[in-house]
Design a protein with these regions (language model features):
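Short helix- or helix-capping micro-motifs
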Residues: 32-36, 168-173, 180, 200, ...
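Membrane-interface transmembrane helices that cradle and orient dolichyl/undecaprenyl
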Residues: 157-159, 163, 198-214, 224, ...
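Membrane-lumen/periplasm interface segments of specific transmembrane helices
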Residues: 267-304, 451-468
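Interfacial juxtamembrane loops and adjacent helix segments
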Residues: 55-58, 64-140, 292-321, 482
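Membrane-interface helix-loop-helix junctions at transmembrane boundaries of multi-pass membrane enzymes
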Residues: 19-23, 158, 250-270, 348-380
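Transmembrane-helix motifs of polytopic, lipid-linked glycan transferases
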Residues: 139-160, 197, 201, 357
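C-terminal luminal/periplasmic domains and tails of membrane-associated envelope-modifying transferases
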Residues: 2-11, 16-19, 476-836
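Signature aromatic-anchored transmembrane alpha helix within multi-pass, membrane-resident enzymes
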Residues: 30-33, 239, 273-274, 353, ...
């Protein structure tokens, strides 16, 4: 079989080959297979992606159809998916074989195989035990991927030679996006590597005219169509344009003409189509029994996909980007590249430009460049002719452009090799380099070997969450989350394990997005976080980045939980993927344990049982911020945690209250001045007071932003309930608890302080009047006017200052002196705030 891919050497002018010369060409593919397979097999049970439970269900249906001989029921996907179904069914069958042989029993299986298959596939879309099968269905996918990587290596070796083939294959094998998708059971990975094998074999046929390459190309084109018919159709234009690049630019061998290559291209396109069509028919059993129905079924599915967006489409964080943008994949592609492939692709494009300029100048290209230039151009059009058409399809997903990553990897390898060759040539021209380097020991392979090993090491550090790798040259995942959808289930396994530790053998109900991906790893009951009730009544709630980005299940739920303090956060690669929150928000039993018990009834409808705060003593700058009202229609950025002191109000409902009611929480000093305030609807409007019934206990969490200029001292809380439409108050709970603020660890910047009336008037060199918060007011006899004056000390003060207040008539004359107050010298605090 190796003879298909290898050029037989001629030994007429050579001595008898050594053992290493005979063994090495066979040993390298074996090593590549092992190296490619190991990271794809390790920890296959680590997490389950959002579609894999469905794929296990489809594989079980396919296995049942195959065992019963009912080929009409083998149509289980909206596309053929035959290679994936066969591999998945093989894994499912082997898992059941391990059970019935006694090697690895499944406790829930009590009947024979056919009965079990009928029971597990009874409810479409729900597979109850994915974790029992996930390794068994993923392993065949990983095995096939490793074999195809070896095939790609052998084809590139015929195309480019051993060193460049080895370098480019390592880039392909350890591309994180390719690596991630060749570890899971789905149709996109087989489509991608079948297309690329077909493409490489097609180019080899154009060059050499050997039938074996045309047969390989057609066979793998058929396999690509059997994986996903729609995208595989792009292979025809890709082959035509790639072949045309070889017809026009490839250096002719002795006796060759351009017309000869042109005829070969036309014959190859027709032959490849016929072979691919025959393979499509022969390898898909459903085509044998009902071919017209199958073809019509595929066409209708393609039309449906093009008309409808993905059910989870949405607007990303920031509101300026959506996956319905026609430029979406132009953001997806660079974010999923590595630094090495990014640089390599840019160098390859530079190679095209440089070669074009030289050709326009009638200059002769170097032999290596002239031979590789058609392939570089063909790979560029591979990307363009795939991404362009698929960008017009309504349903979007980053994995839908997986095939182009094989092309970009080889393109990057060619660009890097071209640059390394040029760089070595420049270095060898230096006189000092001649003492240490020679052409023999200065090769591109040696120069680039360390670079590719460094990249492989960096990628393997993400194991097994390769989906979480994003191009660090573009800011990595921290930046990617604002431009493309992130999260396919990775990290939910970690969240489930964290909750298993928290509950410690007494698991409680958890509401989670992607519940089918969370529940296999959680020991308790899981409900889907698809509506408000799941979030309100569950003891724990798990939010996922994919959900938060797209605004599910509702903007109101996301806004409320964004203001809460999570119990735990799951991070992958420095990016927050899952947030675990405590609950329940609504219950029937009070906890009877509060940091600050209150017991005040407001409005005759709500009993404020108590208040909990995150901390009772902390630095004055620990929870600084400004209260903001969100007017954005886009989902809140969960990783950008809302500022402020976490505070929980515990209410017990007495009766429903008509109208729209807000709660405010204030932080006050001993003189009654406000240093922090938050004001919003109870539960951010999730459960309005007009729905209240007696006996409910509400756990309502807030974040109280504290003024950056707040001085150290003793403070207390105040909670009020009022109608924000009419302004009617329903009571205030005053003097709640005691909170101690210690000196700030870092002094605030003057621009961060909320000063309603900013003056910035210099009193003298060390002291500046920043401003005040007094407003115009009409005073009645005996009334008071309270406010704050803000000072800035530019250097330590060496004396005390006295502040004088007076009333001033319209013409400017002083009417009456109100008060003289001495201010204490403060040498350490940058801000001195006088209150009156």
């Amino acid at each position: 079989m190796n003879d298909i891919f290898l050029r037989k050497p001629s030994y007429r002018s050579l001595a008898t080959p050594t053992i290493s010369q005979r063994v090495l060409p066979l040993l390298i593919p074996v090593i590549i297979f092992i190296v490619a397979l190991l990271p794809r097999l390790a920890n296959l049970d680590s997490f389950i992606t959002a579609d894999e439970d469905d794929q296990i269900m489809f594989s079980s249906l396919f296995l049942k159809s195959a065992l019963t001989g009912d080929l009409s029921n083998a149509l289980v996907l909206g596309y053929p998916g035959v290679p994936t179904l066969i591999l998945g069914a093989t894994g499912v069958g082997l898992r059941y074989a391990a059970h019935y042989s006694g090697l690895s029993p499944l406790p829930w299986v009590t009947a024979d195989l056919m009965t079990t298959l009928r029971e597990t596939t009874l409810e479409r879309g729900v597979f109850a035990h994915p974790l029992d099968f996930i390794v068994w269905v993923r392993a065949p996918m990983a095995l096939l991927a490793a074999l195809c990587i070896v095939a790609i290596y052998l084809l590139i070796r015929r195309l480019l030679g051993e060193p460049l083939a080895l370098f480019s294959t390592l880039i392909i094998a350890f591309d994180p996006f390719i690596l991630a998708h060749t570890r899971v059971i789905h149709v996109d990975a087989p489509l991608a590597y079948f297309m690329f094998v077909s493409f490489l074999a097609f180019l080899l046929y154009i060059i050499h005219g050997r039938w074996k390459f045309l047969i390989i190309s057609g066979l793998f084109a058929g396999l690509a169509a059997l994986s996903k018919t729609g995208p595989s159709a792009f292979l025809g234009p890709i082959m035509a344009v790639g072949g045309l690049a070889y017809v026009l630019l490839y250096p002719l061998a002795k006796g060759q003409t351009r017309w000869m290559l042109t005829r070969r291209l036309m014959f190859a396109l027709g032959g490849c189509g016929l072979i691919g069509g025959a393979a499509f028919f022969a390898l898909w059993p459903s085509m044998w029994s009902q071919p017209f129905f199958v073809i019509n079924w595929i066409v209708r599915n393609l039309q449906s996909v093009n008309r409808s967006a993905h059910p989870t489409t949405g607007v990303f964080w920031g509101g300026g980007m959506t996956d319905q943008s026609p430029y979406y994949y132009f953001f997806v592609l660079p974010f999923h590249l590595t630094p090495l492939t990014t640089v390599g692709v840019l160098l390859a494009l530079s190679m095209i430009i440089w070669s074009g300029i030289n050709l326009l100048r009638k200059m002769t290209l170097r032999p290596w460049v002239a031979e590789k230039l058609p392939l570089v151009i063909a790979l560029v059009f591979y990307v363009i002719l795939f991404v362009g058409p698929i960008s017009m399809v309504s349903r979007r997903g980053d994995r839908y452009i997986l095939p182009v990553f094989f092309a970009t990897s080889l393109l990057a390898a060619l660009g890097l090799w071209w640059f390394a060759t040029w760089l070595i040539r420049q270095i060898l021209r230096l006189r000092i380099a001649r003492f240490y380097l020679t052409k023999k020991n200065s090769t591109p392979g040696r120069l680039l070997g360390g670079v590719i090993l460094a990249q492989i090491t960096a990628i393997l550090m993400y194991h097994p969450y390769y989906l979480a790798y994003f191009n660090p040259l573009l800011g990595g995942g921290q930046m990617a989350q604002h431009y493309l959808n992130i999260g396919w289930g990775e990290g939910l396994d970690t969240a489930a394990r964290h909750l298993n530790d928290i509950t410690k053998g007494r698991p409680e109900q958890v509401a989670s997005w992607y519940s089918s991906q969370f529940s296999p790893y959680y020991q308790g009951r899981t409900v889907d976080l698809s509506d408000i009730n799941a979030a309100l009544y569950s003891p724990y709630t798990v939010f996922y980045i994919n959900q938060a980005q797209r605004g599910f299940p509702s903007q109101e739920i996301l806004e409320y939980f964004h203001q809460r303090q999570p119990l735990d956060v799951v991070k992958i690669g420095g990016v927050e993927y899952a947030w675990i929150y405590g609950g329940p928000i609504l219950s029937s039993e009070p906890t009877n344990s509060y940091m600050f018990p209150v017991g005040t009834i407001l409005g005759g409808a709500a009993n404020l049982l108590g208040v909990d705060v995150n901390q009772q003593t902390f630095a004055a700058d620990a929870f600084v911020g400004q209260a903001k009202v969100s007017e954005s229609k886009s989902p809140p950025v969960f990783s950008d945690h809302a500022p402020g002191l976490p505070i929980t109000l515990h209410w017990q409902t007495i009766s429903k209250v008509p109208g729209e009611h807000n709660v405010y929480i204030r932080l006050l000093d001993e003189d009654g001045h406000v240093w922090g305030k938050v004001d919003r609807l109870i539960l951010a409007g999730l459960w309005r007071p007009d729905r209240w019934r007696p006996g409910f206990v509400i756990r309502d969490e807030y974040r109280l932003p504290i003024d950056p200029a707040t001085p150290p001292g003793k403070y207390h809380l105040e909670v009020g309930l009022y109608d924000f439409v009419t302004g009617q108050t329903y009571g205030i709970a005053k003097n709640i608890g005691q909170i101690t603020l210690t000196p700030a660890k870092t002094q605030p910047n003057v621009n961060d302080v909320n000063v309603p009336h900013r003056l910035m008037t210099a009193i003298n060199q060390p002291l500046t009047l920043v401003g005040h918060n007094y407003n115009d007011v009409t005073l009645t006899p005996g009334a008071e006017m309270n406010g704050k004056i803000f000072w800035q000390a530019n250097q330590p003060l060496d004396r005390d200052y006295q502040v004088q207040f007076w009333l001033q008539a319209p013409k400017g004359q002083a009417v009456r002196t109100l008060k003289n107050v001495s201010a204490t010298t403060q040498k350490d605090d940058r801000y001195i705030v006088y209150e009156s």
